[in-house]
């Protein structure tokens, strides 16, 4: 009987070993994360990773931020690394720039980028130009971040898009996330960069949840600054946007697809340095271009893209003039109906695409 039992147990042990060897842990599933939570997670991971990183701004600490983007960080890291400041943008931006020059890595939050005008000398003259003026000897590793562009019912002094303003300045890097993956990957890359980086968020996107893929859940996840992403493949026309209008472009593309028009939608992610190569490659394939932005038309991001295409190799591939969809050339009105008509809507993008394709 012992011999028989041994003969039985032997194969069972072998089978058990095979089962164990074949067992593997499944990859982490995608999770739903709001843009607000993604920025918070990215800052939290970098604060934990590098003790030189700190956050300062109005109400970022005990109040968890005006838009709750810094929720929980003050309780975790304390007064020395999450710092409430007086209402003086020039003052706390200057402190942040000085700290960056001294070797720290500050994250300077503006409650809205409209208020960054109070600190424009610190951002442009002190932060953006110093690395170059010092022949590369004095880096200024600082992130200026906060909500940018149109919001809801806050009128002209709280609704301006500053992508073109800051994208105009050599020495700055400018990023503009759309979804949660963008937000987390770009804030982490911005914090680690030795150049001053302006991160233009959008108040209306903070509470919007997106699927965060498994790779983006890693603490090592970064999105390279200066690289765009094709959000939707297409063959008939290239549509380029950044920030919230990317979502509008995808909605328009879905509508147009039902009519047999396939749009290639490019999410810029970075305003400066701009990934013009990605746009050129797409235009060479589709032979048509529409740009979409929430900012004003004159000297805007779309105008720069059109100029680059005209001056580069993709121009000879265009079958029709490029078309821009922009915000209205007026200060943002307060009245709801006027406000809605002052920023690009899905119908405006559809109209521009059909105009470009002569449909």
UniProtKB/Swiss-Prot annotation:
The keyword DNA-binding does not apply. CDD domains: TPP_PYR_E1-PDHc-beta_like. Its cofactor is thiamine diphosphate. GO terms for cellular component: acetyltransferase complex; catalytic complex; mitochondrial matrix; mitochondrion; nucleoplasm; pyruvate dehydrogenase complex. It catalyses: N(6)-[(R)-lipoyl]-L-lysyl-[protein] + pyruvate + H(+) = N(6)-[(R)-S(8)-acetyldihydrolipoyl]-L-lysyl-[protein] + CO2. GO terms for molecular function: metal ion binding; pyruvate dehydrogenase (acetyl-transferring) activity; pyruvate dehydrogenase (NAD+) activity. It comes from the Eukaryota. K(+) binds at residues 142, 190-191, 193, 195. The record marks 319 as: Important for interaction with DLAT. The modification Phosphotyrosine is found at residue 67. Keywords: Acetylation, Carbohydrate metabolism, Glucose metabolism, Metal-binding, Mitochondrion, Oxidoreductase, Phosphoprotein, Potassium, Pyruvate, Thiamine pyrophosphate, Transit peptide, Tricarboxylic acid cycle. Coiled coil: none annotated. Residues 1-30 form a transit peptide. The pyruvate dehydrogenase complex catalyzes the overall conversion of pyruvate to acetyl-CoA and CO(2), and thereby links the glycolytic pathway to the tricarboxylic cycle. This is Pyruvate dehydrogenase E1 component subunit beta, mitochondrial. It comes from Mus musculus.
């Amino acid at each position: 009987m012992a011999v028989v039992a041994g003969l039985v147990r032997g194969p069972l042990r072998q089978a058990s070993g095979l089962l164990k060897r074949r067992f593997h842990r499944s990859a982490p599933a995608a999770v739903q994360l709001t843009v607000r939570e993604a920025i918070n997670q990215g800052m939290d991971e970098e604060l934990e990773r590098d003790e030189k990183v700190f956050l300062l701004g109005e109400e970022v600490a005990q109040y968890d931020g005006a838009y709750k983007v810094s929720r929980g960080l003050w309780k975790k890291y304390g007064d020395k690394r999450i710092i409430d400041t007086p209402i003086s943008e020039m003052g706390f931006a200057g402190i942040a720039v000085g700290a960056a020059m001294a070797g720290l890595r500050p994250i300077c939050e503006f409650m809205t980028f409209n208020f960054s005008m109070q600190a424009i000398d610190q951002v442009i003259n002190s932060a953006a130009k110093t690395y170059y003026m010092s022949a590369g000897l004095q880096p200024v590793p600082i992130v200026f971040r906060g909500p940018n562009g149109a919001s809801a019912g806050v009128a002209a002094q709280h609704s301006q898009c500053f992508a073109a303003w800051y994208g105009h300045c050599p020495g700055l890097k400018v990023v503009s996330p759309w979804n949660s993956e963008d937000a987390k990957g770009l804030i982490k890359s911005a914090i680690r960069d030795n150049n001053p980086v302006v991160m233009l968020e959008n108040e209306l996107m903070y509470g919007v949840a997106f699927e965060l893929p498994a790779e983006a859940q890693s603490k090592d996840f970064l999105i390279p600054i200066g690289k765009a992403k094709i959000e939707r493949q297409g063959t008939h026309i290239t549509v380029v946007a950044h920030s919230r209008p990317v979502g509008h472009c995808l909605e328009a593309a879905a509508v147009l697809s039902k009519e047999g028009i396939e749009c290639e939608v490019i999410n810029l992610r970075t305003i400066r340095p701009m990934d013009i190569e990605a746009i050129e490659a797409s235009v060479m394939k589709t032979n048509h271009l529409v740009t979409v932005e929430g900012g004003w038309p004159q000297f805007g991001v779309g105008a720069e893209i059109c100029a680059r295409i005209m001056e580069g190799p993709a121009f000879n591939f265009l079958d029709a003039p490029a078309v821009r969809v922009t915000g209205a050339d007026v200060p943002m009105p307060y009245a709801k109906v006027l406000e809605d008509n002052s920023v690009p809507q899905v119908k405006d993008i559809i109209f521009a695409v059909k105009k470009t394709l002569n449909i």
